[in-house]
Amino acid sequence: MIDYTAVEAYGNPILVDDHDNRVSAFREIVQLTKKPHNALAIVQLSHPGRQGSKALNPHPISASDVHLKLKWAGNEFAPPRAMSLDDIRHNIKQWGQSAYLAWQAGFDGVQIHCAHGYLLAQFLSPSTNLRTDSYGGTPTNRARLIFEIIAEIDRRVRTHDPTFLLCVKLNSVEFQDRGTTPQEARDLCIALEAARVDFVDLSGGTFEGRAFHHVKDSTRAREAYFIEFAEMIRPLLQKTKVFVTGGFRSASGMALAVEQGACDGVGIGRPLAAEPYLCRDILAGRVSGAIENLVPLPMNTQASGTQLHQVAKGEELVSDWSASAEVERWIEENERETKRKIQVLPRVDSSGFPWLRAERGFAYLK
């Protein structure tokens, strides 16, 4: 997160300044990430806008004062305030500062999160951007903030280090009646290439319209939720690379997406929470894909958080969500944790994910 006062959920890491030597702590993460294969370390920067838990973000800001009226994993969302021009100028500097600190920590680049209904997606979408000034109205105006952030990151970092990578995570389609269209998103990708964005990571959907439920059968067959959009824009981009994140589970599906030219690379999220060495094992030919996850949507995001806690605590096992008994145990614990969090509000005393000691799982450390 780029702002102490704007977090999306419990446990969000924040990179705003060097308080408590956090740049050194992030540098440690970078060093571990790069070993032993000298992998690239790119950190995602984000601002939730209106889409942050009411308990943690009681006075949110957004492109406009459009309230997100739903509950998500036990969270409610406060009505947002439309950002003033001063707010926007300050926000631009925050993105630049966080990118600069990431560079100081040794990251090879940053990803600007413009997807999943968070702040920059709120500016892009006519559903949430009702502004009548230079940041609203036309697709160009709604995207203006993103390009001003890119210019600030160029000023703070890339003028000093041209090798610093810049990525934009983008909604391919918002799956809302008045959301951004694939054509608008395609035009945006072309403009991002002109702004020297190194790669775009295509995803989609918001809390209001979970994209993972609204995909074509042909897309489901190839696993990636947003691959059809990638196929449309990749031939139009000369230098900017296209990645697709969302839905990949089998090695064959990942390979096919790249071999057929739909994208240059694939992103994997939740499967890595269960199997930290999944990528290594796929490349070595030891496994053919990720294990099945029986935790129902949308709770499986929370379930992945539990797995990350198990890894962070050095537990011997990571829960196996392909085992129905383990899933049932987790669902019961999740209900208890949700009730407990509500009772202690506004105090925040945990990361928000239910804690569970695995009974059926993977000995990932062996």
Task: Locate each region found by the language model.
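Flavin-dependent oxidoreductase catalytic cores
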Residues: 1-366
